[in-house]
Amino acid sequence: MALCVHSFWATAVDTATSCHFISSENCLVLLQALKINIYLCSEVHGLQFFTSIPLFSTVKHIRPYRPPGLDRDYLFVVLNDDTYFSIYWDEDYQKVIVDHPPVRYRVTFPWNRNAKSYCLVDLRMRAIFLSIDEISMICIRILSAEERLKTGRSIDSGFPFSFPVHLIYDMCILNDSSTPTLVVLHSDGLDCYVTAFLLDLSSKSLGKGIRLFERVKPSMIMPFGKRGLLVFESLFIHCMYRGNFVTINGPCTTYMHWTPLKGQKMHYIVCDTNGYLFGVYSSILGKNKWSLVMERLPIPPFDFITSLNSIHEGLLFIGSKNSESKLINLSTLKDVDSIPNLGPIHDLLVLKNDIEKSFLVCAGTPRNASLIYFQHALKLDILGQTKISGILRAMVLPSYPEHKLFLGFPSETVAFNIKEDFQLELDPSLSTKERTIALSGTNGEFVQVTSTFLCIYDSAKRSRLVYIEKITNAACYQEYSAIVINGTALAIFKKDTEVARKVFESEISCLDFSAQFQIGVGFWSKQVMILTFSDNSSISCAFQTNVPSLPRNIILEGVGVDRNLLLVSSGSGEFKSYVLFKNNLVFSETKHFGTTPVSFRRFTMNIGTYIICNNDCPHMVYGFNGALCYMPLSMPQSYDVCQFRDNSGKDFLISVSLGGLKFLQLNPLPELTPRKVLLEHVPLQAIIFQNKLLLRTLENRYEDYESYKENYHLELVDSYDDNSFRVFSFTENERCEKVLKINESSLLVGTSIIEQDKLVPVNGRLILLEFEKELQSLKVVSSMVLSAAVIDLGVYNDRYIVAFGQQVAIVKLTEERLMIDSRISLGSIVLQLIVEGNEIAIADSIGRFTIMYFDGQKFIVVARYLFGENIVKAALYEGTVYIIATNSGLLKLLRYNKDAKNFNDRFICESVYHLHDKVSKFQNFPITNTNSFLEPKMLFATEIGAIGSIVSLKDKELELEELTRKIRKLKFSYLSSMDYESIEADLISPVPFIDGDLVIDVKRWASSELFRLCRSVEHRESLNSYQKVQALLEEIQSLC
């Protein structure tokens, strides 16, 4: 079975560095997933993406260095597959060039794979130091200009050396020392010491070492000034500088990263494990006298900071794996730019009974918790934009005699002609010092209602004015105008002649004039009406109903003979729809989209009329002749929208926002689009209960920046609302580990109990809960204490199955009491249960995958497979095929053959895919369109916020495999053929996983990327190389 994997890579920043990778430009180099992304950085423009460098493995280190005699920096890249290489940017060919080819610097595994690795660059650009194992490093010398010309490389092959100390906790290089001096924080098992070692590059020998600090317990060391050193302890900060030692008090915390402020001497920024930032400053007071100050910066804390980088004087980049990464102006402490990030993903939930294929993601950390709804949405592409501030409303008058755009401001209306390429030309003859409320045109004339008059223009722009006092609202349809006077009177005009008038008891809040002789009206008395009239007749009410709150917006649409659709927005994100036949109510429903009031706008195309529901969660309403349908709409945030159609018949939209106007065109193919809802607590699991979401949440209460307490809750939340209410809370020492839905009114909960001052759970509890008072609260029906923490729950036939510690047990409910029927001990911690029919699949902590069943009295093991590493997640893909995610970021396909006679031959590992990320959740996602080979069958999520899909390939496996090989070869064309072939050999699998990312990415390549790719193919632009790439794209289109 061949599978295709397509992942939406996370935006988490693994690490970052600032340099001049491109000469004369401030560059920020970000490591995100399997790419090195280069951004140009400035205070005015923020982060501007420049180029991306694909990688064949995740990055362990990336360090800039500048070879002598050059004005730009090279990048030294160390990968997690124990390979390093160096690259630089070629200004002539505008492409990445490999300076030093990939070299595997370690051929044996260290005894401690979790030991911290170090990569240090000497500021005098003499050498790069890279860890080989716990005590050994390799010194790679940076070559001089003469040596670089001879060898064609900027670095040599290096030489190894070892420290005479063990248990190294941190390491740095002193600044401006005549001989490279490495300072090591190490321990003898009882106490910690700080020792400096001088490395002689000519003799390749390491000195004996000079003890700088004894019996300290620091968390970080860093260079300070010229040949100075800072040692950070949990309560004190020690400084060695100019032969003196100074100690100051510091916060009780553990430090992680540091960066010197560029342009500032003796100024540093450090961060701790809680995500807080601190400034460390020093100033010279006199001869051998200086001061040292540390203060906490008033910047909100970050989750899991991965890097601190000073770009240039005043700018600081903070990279994060679990929250937004930000570029901050230190002078104003304001955000200049940011890179959004979901954070770790805890759960995936497919939203069933949904006409669109949509799913829900639970993600985040205590400071970045959110629900993300992924729905197929219609997308509005931005074709152009114009910066104009202060616009209240935009209105388009088509073909008079050319398209006119009227922009309403608080005290004036400015008219423009819409030219080609969406250029605007001012038309002063139609501009006025009055605010325009409504506009309509027909037969070479148009009607304009402002705050003080009704104006009718003919084709020669001659106007007839009717002055009306106290106009509060208005709507126009062709030559008719419905004008609200003094809030309560409604006057109907045909051109400049009044044909009907009626005064109401309540003030009118909104109205819509969409069809001849019919008007939809909303009142402050929380009523809506459909009014009818005819020329020279009175106004009568054809339909009337009450609404729960004040109607803010209304739209009335005729959808056939005697059939109307009435939409009323009456609250924050809530609106009600009414379908009427001969003004009798046929159907009504209430919808809730977003959290801000909905405004309605028509969007008429050749295929029919749609209603745009615009707020912070835009939607499109269609299907007026049958059941109403609602499709999410992906569009720029705006507070007003209008439509216009050009001379060729193409339909466009104009959106109004604080930044000005955007010209949009509807893309008819729906795309998977996220919508984020922020939460106060971290959602760990989601279950649907009666059209509501039941969330298992984690609340972290920060006592101060040093400590916090955690509590687990069960909360209910509406699908389109960020408001939630708590239905059950657990005690402070009890963690809610798993929730299992039994039916629409009850659920089974597994917990772990931690005693005070204990790090691991001492036991667990199984709780049966039941809803009462219409999902208002949960009550405990039954509970039982278990000997270990509950890990997983499932339903097995008419009973429940629970995994706790090393045991798996069958639990039954008898007379509202939970009782263990039978149990089995597996000898290792159980990580996951998968129940399919009578078979139970179990993944445990030592990498075993076991299948067994329960015969009514005992468990019987029928198959077992041992992986060479830990299993993090497993799922039943289809039939008897399981997909396994391992700790090293691999996906493995495991087929179960129950008919095999030999117990050890019942599992066959069919293929392997290098995902380079740890999977946190698998979720089945049924296929609806079998014609598309990339239609997902299973979704997966990862620990750094990536979401992906997997699908079986029923045909074209060999063609697609060959196609991905071609694309991959082009993708890594900056490598030599020999280096690429060694990478390709590692990716070969008997039954292939097809990399869907390659195919999708190439389909989206822009022309600039194609030309850059052509340079990569043949190192110069040529028609021949372009034809190769174009042929590849045509092949993709034919297969996909």
UniProtKB/Swiss-Prot annotation:
It is found in: Nucleus; Cytoplasm, Cytoskeleton, Microtubule organizing center, Spindle pole body; Chromosome. The lineage of its organism: Eukaryota, Fungi, Dikarya, Ascomycota, Taphrinomycotina. Belongs to the DDB1 family. GO terms for biological process: heterochromatin formation; meiotic telomere tethering at nuclear periphery; pericentric heterochromatin formation; RNA metabolic process; silent mating-type cassette heterochromatin formation; siRNA-mediated heterochromatin formation; subtelomeric heterochromatin formation. GO terms for molecular function: nucleic acid binding. Component of the Clr4 methyltransferase complex (ClrC) composed of at least clr4, rik1, pcu4, rbx1, raf1 and raf2. The cullin pcu4, rik1, raf1, raf2 and the ring-box protein rbx1 are components of an E3 ubiquitin ligase, whose activity is essential for heterochromatin assembly. Coiled coil: none annotated. One of its GO terms (cellular component) is pericentric heterochromatin. Component of the Clr4 methyltransferase complex (ClrC) which contributes to the establishment of heterochromatin by specifically methylating histone H3 to form H3K9me. ClrC preferentially ubiquitylates H3K14 and ClrC-mediated H3 ubiquitination promotes clr4 methyltransferase activity for the methylation of H3K9. H3K9me represents a specific tag for epigenetic transcriptional repression by recruiting swi6/HP1 to methylated histones which leads to transcriptional silencing within centromeric heterochromatin, telomeric regions and at the silent mating-type loci. Disruption phenotype: Cells show derepressed silent mating-type cassettes. The keyword Zinc-finger does not apply. InterPro entries: Beta-prop_RSE1/DDB1/CPSF1_1st, Cleavage/polyA-sp_fac_asu_C, RSE1/DDB1/CFT1/CPSF1, WD40/YVTN_repeat-like_dom_sf. Signal peptide: none annotated. Transmembrane segments: none annotated. Keywords: Chromatin regulator, Chromosome, Cytoplasm, Cytoskeleton, Nucleus, Transcription, Transcription regulation. This is Chromatin modification-related protein rik1. It comes from Schizosaccharomyces pombe (strain 972 / ATCC 24843).
